Amino acid sequence: MLLRFTKMHGLGNDFMVLDLVSQHAHVQPKHVKLWGDRNTGVGFDQLLIVEAPSSPDVDFRYRIFNADGSEVEQCGNGARCFARFVQDKRLTVKKSIRVETKGGIIELNIRPDGQVTVDMGPPRLAPAEIPFQAEREALSYEIEVNGQRVELAAVSMGNPHGVLRVENVDSAPVHSLGPQLEVHPRFPKKANIGFLQVLDPHHARLRVWERGVGETQACGTGACAAAVAGIRQGWLQSPVQIDLPGGRLHIEWAGPGQPVMMTGPAVRVYEGQVRL
């Protein structure tokens, strides 16, 4: 059978989006890996699936698969594309929608200028909720990697993140340290690793090594986690502009217990069909 899909991106973080509300199919990891190959398939960082809600409290169910076939809890850039997709496909007429993810419920708001604001909910900072192995919650933790001590903050935005402050993201060891920290045993479910350069209290640069993907052009949850870590450490103040290789995100966070608000673009690239 043939399935219709839309290729989208948020700041260069690219997605294949499938509507499984009006189409019906059982997508398996082998399909995701086949479609995700940039040489022989569609090629993407993540596959986003739109499904009917499982409860009346939400409008849709939002599922996310990395290109390696693994299902993950959350994707912020994908959430913005999800919001644009369901409106463009007229699956909803609402400007504000609630969607259910593996990482919890998030709210998506489409602005008149076409940008999308995502209420990502409050960050989770307790080690057991991230999950991260530590005796107690702290602003930062020391991790040993190949005999070297690395200091990072641990934050969950529905998915686990480690955030390191660096002097310059251009020379940061993203491709050497990133994959080692991603699979570090203190992150039982692996982690996305952000390398944060603070420019001033309201402006920072970020590169992210994403779990199961590698470095991407942008990571929405990574930008949220970096802003939270920076604000908690006193390096940053809300609102924060986070510059990623693919572009800029606007992050607001009022402090503990408050939701993180992320605003940025969502772009449709093309429509296509794939064989299941």
UniProtKB/Swiss-Prot annotation:
SUPFAM superfamilies hit by this protein: Diaminopimelate epimerase-like
What is one process in the GO biological process aspect for this record? lysine biosynthetic process via diaminopimelate
UniProt-listed Enzyme Commission number(s)? 5.1.1.7
What is the name of this protein? Diaminopimelate epimerase
Entry keywords, A to Z:
Amino-acid biosynthesis, Cytoplasm, Isomerase, Lysine biosynthesis
* Pfam assignment, any one: DAP_epimerase
- The organism encoding this protein is Pseudomonas paraeruginosa (strain DSM 24068 / PA7)
**Residues annotated as catalytic:** 75 (proton donor), 219 (proton acceptor)
